[in-house]
Amino acid sequence: MPTSSVSHDRLTDMKQFGTDPGSLHADTYIPKNFPKNGPLVVVLHGSTQSAESYNRGSGWSSLADECGIALLYPEQRKTNNPLSSFNWFKSGDSRRGDGEPLSIRQMIEQVVDDHAIDPSRIFVTGMSSGGAMTSVMLATYPEVFAGGAIIAGLPYRSADNLIEAMVRMKGYGGPSDHRLDALVREASTFEGPWATISVWHGGSDSTVDNANADSIVRQWQQIHKVEGPPTRVEELDGFPRQIWCNAGGQEVIEEYIIKGMGHGTPIMAGGDEGLGEADKYMLEVGISSTRHIAHFWGLTE
């Protein structure tokens, strides 16, 4: 089984993927053992990161080799945002059929066509601005995704401009619970079944307050009709995992608040099941969000 050591520059530049109204770049990683009708994970990097740096830190391509997963890495251009952040708070980049979400949708369509992806097994994850853009994709193109994982992110449409975004990141204000539900439902005509949701956040995150994690959970609790306290709480790698199950007993939402962790993606680089490398915003805390997210989605079985 692979360890945390991964080679650099593992990704392949994606040359063509539609009209690209959001003016994004894209990279892919298709493992040699990728099967026909295999799954696809869309991975969205955070601010000041690149597709390659996030892949290296998170270890997604190592897990892809292990489990036969195709990866798509949308990448922001500095001409769009000087910090390389996805523009999740701009109205033109948070609507179906427009801007960055449409670019990402076009990338997905191209990868599905090029590599015979199973359209029922497409997933999306991201950290920080990539986590917030994950919320955007889950709301604006819900028919595309079987699951989403939001790391150190924010709820869909919690902010509509940069000033609001900065305030929300600090944990202040934001839509009511009723409005959080309505924002997702108004983003498309989709009526379900909805993606399962995995939420990860540092308990000591001073960049994006972990109140946002709870808001994300509440947004999707209403969509999945699982309001109220978690169905159960269990311990995984020493951290509490809260789980909400629907009426059929399916786990539809999980939440991890990693005590003592700051802003970033939780990784476990060492050991037989280690993935990734510690770096800025890639935080060694003894639990691999990458591996556990993939397991939640049924990709490690």
Where are these regions (language model features)?
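A domain-start/cap signature at the N-terminus of enzymes
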Residues: 1-40, 52-70, 96-99, 119-121, ...
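Structural cue for short, hydrophobic secondary-structure segments
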Residues: 43-46, 73, 199, 257
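Active-site glycine-rich loops that stabilize anionic/oxyanionic intermediates
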Residues: 46-50, 261
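Cap/lid segment of the alpha/beta-hydrolase catalytic domain
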Residues: 75-99, 161-162
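Alpha/beta-hydrolase active-site loop
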Residues: 92-115, 136
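A conserved short beta-strand
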Residues: 144-155
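Short beta-strand/loop motif that positions the catalytic acidic residue
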Residues: 199-201, 205
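Conserved alpha/beta-hydrolase "acid-adjacent" motif
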Residues: 207-212, 266-267
